[in-house]
């Protein structure tokens, strides 16, 4: 075997061994929410994230772009977080946040100093439990998504390339369209359709909550029960 191949195998094996050393705790809450906890006290920071098992593959062919649209819409606020305040709460507590969508899932996260762990858990419980979905939020985020498409697709060289490839690769499969979807479909959708999509997919039993960083496992579990056991699965 060439020396290069031997070296590659050794390095690859070492990488696998290191990956296996990551310890975590996982369990399910009674409402179906899957929880993953990883303790790493090397720095005073925590990451709180929720992954929903919903992406563009879960959309109807005449209503594409819904999952990506909800990536934006669920930052609009909740019954306990005023419109436009979500990101202000994050930044004012020393954190940052973002979200992204693929064909298979939608992912939200916050990173905070570890003394703001409860803030992160509360924010995600509000997003899941009490989202406010109304006409003004839908209209606002519709314009945001249109601008994103203009910037990243319409006004980029070969911006439509991936979409054209997917159409040809997956002619009879929901991978046929890219997550950003059709602006015409979003324009035609009614408020009731958006509300129904939210109730169907953005629920505890369709989500994974992961928390990693400078945490105390028992205290974190208590916070999980405080903010998530009251959630409904319907």
Predicted regions and their residues:
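Active/ligand-binding-proximal structured segments within catalytic/core domains
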Residues: 32, 41-89
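Envelope-exposed proteins and targeting segments
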Residues: 23-25, 31-33, 44-50, 104-106, ...
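Preference for bulky hydrophobic residues occupying beta-strand positions
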Residues: 27, 35-37, 48-52, 110, ...
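Bacterial Sec-dependent N-terminal signal peptides
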Residues: 1-21
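Charge-rich, well-structured scaffold segments of protease-associated domains
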Residues: 28, 85-234
């Amino acid at each position: 075997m060439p020396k290069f191949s031997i070296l590659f195998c050794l390095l690859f094996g070492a990488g696998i061994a290191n990956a296996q050393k990551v310890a975590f705790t996982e369990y399910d809450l009674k409402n179906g929410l899957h929880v993953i906890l990883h303790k790493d006290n090397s720095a005073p920071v925590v990451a709180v994230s929720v992954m929903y098992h919903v992406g563009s593959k879960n959309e109807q062919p005449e209503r594409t772009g819904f999952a990506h649209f909800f990536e934006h819409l669920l930052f609009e606020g909740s019954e306990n977080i005023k419109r436009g305040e979500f990101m202000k709460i994050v930044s004012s507590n020393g954190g940052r946040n973002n979200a992204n969508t693929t064909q298979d899932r939608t992912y939200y996260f916050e990173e905070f100093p570890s003394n703001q762990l409860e803030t992160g858990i509360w924010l995600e419980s509000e997003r899941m439990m009490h989202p406010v979905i109304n006409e003004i939020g839908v209209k606002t985020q519709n314009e945001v998504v249109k601008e994103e498409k203009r910037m990243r697709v319409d006004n980029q060289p070969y911006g439509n390339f991936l979409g054209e490839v997917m159409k040809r690769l997956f002619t009879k499969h929901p991978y046929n369209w890219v997550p950003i979807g059709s602006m015409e479909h979003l324009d035609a959708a009614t408020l009731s359709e958006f509300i129904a999509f939210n109730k169907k997919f953005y629920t505890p039993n369709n989500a994974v909550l992961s928390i990693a960083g400078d945490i105390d496992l028992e205290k974190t579990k208590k916070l999980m029960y405080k903010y998530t056991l009251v959630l409904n699965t319907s």
